[in-house]
Amino acid sequence: MPNEVYDVTIIGGGPIGLFSAFYSGLRSMKTKIIDAEPDVGGKVRYFFPEKIIRDIGGIPAITGANLVANLKEQAETFHPTIVCNERVVDVTKLTDGVFQLTSHNGSIHFSKTVVIATGSGTFEVNKLEAMHVDDFPLAINYDVKNLEQFRDKIVTVSGGGNSAIDWAQTLEPIAKKVHLIYRGEDFKAHEESVRELKNSRVEIHIHHEIKELIGANNQLASIKICCNQTQVTKTIETEALFINHGVKVDLGTMAEWGFELADFGIVVDDEMKTTVPGIFACGDSATYSRKIRIIAAGLHEGPIAINSAKKYLEPTARDEAMISTHHESFIG
């Protein structure tokens, strides 16, 4: 039913959006998820399917793909409507208080409340810029679907953040050799990850950038890197590249939706309320003082946003859902 009105529509089907959908089911809210990508899972599905995630309480280690699969299964407990391949470009509050959401393809959705869980927005990876980069498309990787493609190869990872360091360490026991190229000196990563990296067999090249790819017949053989302090170049043998230079994020038309934005997202209060009544935000979409940007924190913010949406609809409703072990859906 195209004109069906939902209690809550969650924009974004990443980990936080999926868990928010599960929690909204605990609150007996009719729920829809709208995601711009072909499938739910967000950046975790796209960038980290084989990366080991360790910063969620009670889960010592899990791959990104398995985390997304578990969250999707959990989200589907209460049968939310899931719409993919639609990017929401406009949210308008109608005279009756219902929000009209318009997608890039012209589709219209109606909802009494909206929870924004789009992360940093839609994203596009920053591509490697170097001589002959177009000659070796199969050797350049921006995400990893299968670690086995790197087995017994000489691999170079380029980047200096958590993801680049994690991938270098993940590839170390699989690849024949791993190089890590970073244009800076101080890695922008967790202290323990940096310590482990420096104690590993990964060969680190700080203050270096990739300048040229060398090979024949579309087969990469080596790369030329340059020190940005001395301008001295050197060539290192490399069969595969993993590039982690961050992403270009696009909040799209959100700036026109009426709520307050800051440098790192949508401004919310401690109830995940935006400055527009009825619209809430959580996960990397939201920003507030002393925010922690890890999945575990977002999994906490999602239920807060849903509870606020529930109270917006029903001011006399309980402040929070009954814990799942006591919920009627899981008893008997």
UniProtKB/Swiss-Prot annotation:
Cofactor note as given: Binds 1 FAD per subunit.
Keyword Protein transport: no
Gene Ontology MF, one: flavin adenine dinucleotide binding
Cofactor: FAD
Key words of the record: FAD, Flavoprotein, NADP, Oxidoreductase
Gene3D superfamilies: FAD/NAD(P)-binding domain
Record-listed FAD binding positions: D35, K43, F48, V88, F123, D284, T325
Pfam families: Pyr_redox_2
InterPro entries registered for this protein in UniProt: FAD/NAD-bd_sf, FAD/NAD-binding_dom, Fd--NADP_Rdtase_type_2, Ferredoxin-NADP_redctase_2
SUPFAM superfamilies recorded: FAD/NAD(P)-binding domain
Highest taxon in the source lineage: Bacteria
Regions crossing the membrane: none
Reactions that this protein is recorded to catalyse: 2 reduced [2Fe-2S]-[ferredoxin] + NADP(+) + H(+) = 2 oxidized [2Fe-2S]-[ferredoxin] + NADPH
Broad class of enzyme this protein falls into: oxidoreductase
Coiled coil: none
Disulfide bonds: none
EC number of this enzyme: 1.18.1.2
Self-association and partners: Homodimer.
Family: Belongs to the ferredoxin--NADP reductase type 2 family.
Protein's name in the database: Ferredoxin--NADP reductase 1
